[in-house]
């Protein structure tokens, strides 16, 4: 009888531990979602990136080309302990798990291809309210 009770309580304890872990993971994602939202709100341009990613480098190069007065705020996910959690929160928010994810004035612009396309079409300059330099 004691062994049966021990197993039942052991299973209950394991279930409680699992539920607590799920709860802390969910609250971790919620806090990372708050981090993403507050970061996007606090800066004109935000790039969620990974330092080794060629697509991220391409998106960052677009903003260098524009010669903005204020550089984009870059969050290098691979250089943060909570980078995976932030990436999960981004995925929940924008429906994409890939990087980069670019935000301009609080609005999601997209990834690398979206950023380059917006730059080439002039849409990005309009979003940033800057004059486009014409090639001579």
Swiss-Prot record:
GO terms for molecular function: glutathione disulfide oxidoreductase activity. PROSITE patterns: GLUTAREDOXIN_1, GLUTAREDOXIN_2. GO terms for cellular component: cytoplasm. Pfam families: Glutaredoxin (PF00462). InterPro entries: GLR_AS (IPR011767), Glutaredoxin (IPR002109), Glutaredoxin_euk/vir (IPR011899), Glutaredoxin_subgr (IPR014025), Thioredoxin-like_sf (IPR036249). It comes from the Eukaryota. Its main location: cytoplasm. Disulfide bonds join 53-56. It is found in: Cytoplasm. Keywords: Cytoplasm, Disulfide bond, Electron transport, Redox-active center, Transport. Residues 33-135 form the Glutaredoxin domain. CDD domains: GRX_GRXh_1_2_like (cd03419). GO terms for biological process: cellular response to oxidative stress. Belongs to the glutaredoxin family. CPYC subfamily. Has a glutathione-disulfide oxidoreductase activity in the presence of NADPH and glutathione reductase. Reduces low molecular weight disulfides and proteins. This is Glutaredoxin-C8.
């Amino acid at each position: 009888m004691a062994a049966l009770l021990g197993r039942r309580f052991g299973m209950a304890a394991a279930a409680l531990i699992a539920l607590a872990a799920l709860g802390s993971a969910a609250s971790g994602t919620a806090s990372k979602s708050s981090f993403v939202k507050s970061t996007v709100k606090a800066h004109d341009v935000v790039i969620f990136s990974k330092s080794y990613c060629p697509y991220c480098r391409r998106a960052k190069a677009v903003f260098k080309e524009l010669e903005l007065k204020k550089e984009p705020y870059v969050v290098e996910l691979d250089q943060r302990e909570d980078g995976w959690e932030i990436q999960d929160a981004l995925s929940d928010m924008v429906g994409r798990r890939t990087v980069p994810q670019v935000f301009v004035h609080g609005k999601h612009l997209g990834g690398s291809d979206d950023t380059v396309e917006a730059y080439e079409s002039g849409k990005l300059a309009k979003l940033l309210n800057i004059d486009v330099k014409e090639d001579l």
